[in-house]
């Protein structure tokens, strides 16, 4: 591998470690010319499916867009970056495991909603309100009822 500091073609692997998830190898390398050290990461490159939008247009899968959607819904919520990274990884794993060459944007939206429901209920309602285009307060209430299940009955929403 070429040295990023001096451009020399010969480097030596000093140390290799497998990540905790087992899907990445971290390698410490030393340049045989300038003696500087640097880190590289090796992982399998899999092609994500093409996203088919509601209007029928197609675009490449964009992990930054997925992460941005999650971050927006989770803004000012007590969810760590590691938890967001885990959600992105689970969504991507699901998409890759499907083996599909194309995936509907609606399917990705449903995967995001499932992850948000697990991570943070408020973020779930935020995302659902935009994703499902809520038009009135009744739709918010219905989404909350569905999420809460039988614990939130109609009697608890009435003013006493």
UniProtKB/Swiss-Prot annotation:
One of its GO terms (molecular function) is zinc ion binding. Keywords: ATP-binding, DNA-binding, Metal-binding, Nucleotide-binding, Repressor, Transcription, Transcription regulation, Zinc, Zinc-finger. InterPro entries: ATP-cone_dom (IPR005144), NrdR-like_N (IPR055173), RNR_NrdR-like (IPR003796). Its cofactor is Zn(2+). Residues 49-139 form the ATP-cone domain. One of its GO terms (biological process) is negative regulation of DNA-templated transcription. Negatively regulates transcription of bacterial ribonucleotide reductase nrd genes and operons by binding to NrdR-boxes. Belongs to the NrdR family. This is Transcriptional repressor NrdR. It comes from Bordetella avium (strain 197N).
